[in-house]
Every structure is written in C-alpha cells, then in structure tokens.
Amino acid sequence: MSDKEFMWALKNGDLDEVKDYVAKGEDVNRTLEGGRKPLHYAADCGQLEILEFLLLKGADINAPDKHNITPLLSAVYEGHVSCVKLLLSKGADKTVKGPDGLTAFEATDNQAIKTLLQ
C-alpha cells in the first residue's frame, strides 16, 4: 500500500478505494507522507463521504497534523461548509488554534462557516 495511492483516493473522493485500503488493514489514524492523517486530506479536499467513513472507522477528529492543523481547521481554511458542519456535529474542537494563532472562527470570512462555528 503506497501512501501516494491512498492519499490520491482520499483527495479525489474514491470511497471504494479508501474502503479497500482500510479493509486491508490501513490505520485511519496513521500519519501519511507529508505529515498529515487521512482525515486531513479528506477535509482539505471537501470529501464529505470519505470524512464520514473515516470517522465511522475511528479516525481521531481532533488529531493535529505536522503543522498543528486539525481536520476542522483544514475544512475551514478551504471553505468546505458541509465538511465543517459534519466535523462539528461529530464533536470537533472549535477552540483549537492553528499555527497562525487563530481559531477556526477567526480564520474565516465565510459567513456560513462563521454561523456554524458560533
């Protein structure tokens, strides 16, 4: 199992491929090449179904990546409203600060996301 192939499936929303990796023993909390976990890649790319699947399989919703960015912050930075909504509904910590010292609320100008974070 190559990290690059797994990351491609995560980023591009290939749920069947992600399920296959997990069925073959891929750890949903393992840090991949690039210093990020699977949940970060899915959140970063707006892959809602992948996020739901990874969370169902026990992915740590508040795990930081190598830059101390959580999956919630990843989704906020990229403006993925549906991903932000899902992560919050599953208990993501909205008080965590990113490497810039800002919370998710402070880091976005997106009004829909701000409303969710209030």
Curated annotation (Swiss-Prot):
SMART domains: ANK. GO terms for biological process: positive regulation of cardiac muscle hypertrophy; positive regulation of cell growth; positive regulation of macromolecule biosynthetic process; positive regulation of NF-kappaB transcription factor activity; positive regulation of protein metabolic process; regulation of barbed-end actin filament capping. InterPro entries: Ankyrin_rpt (IPR002110), Ankyrin_rpt-contain_sf (IPR036770). Keywords: ANK repeat, Cytoplasm, Nucleus, Repeat. One of its GO terms (cellular component) is nucleus. PROSITE patterns: ANK_REP_REGION (PS50297), ANK_REPEAT (PS50088). SUPFAM superfamilies: Ankyrin repeat (SSF48403). It comes from the Eukaryota. ANK repeats lie at residues 1-30, 34-65, 67-98. It is found in: Cytoplasm; Nucleus; Cytoplasm, Perinuclear region. Belongs to the myotrophin family. Regulates NF-kappa-B transcription factor activity. Promotes growth of cardiomyocytes, but not cardiomyocyte proliferation. Promotes cardiac muscle hypertrophy. Plays a role in the regulation of the growth of actin filaments. Inhibits the activity of the F-actin-capping protein complex. This is Myotrophin.
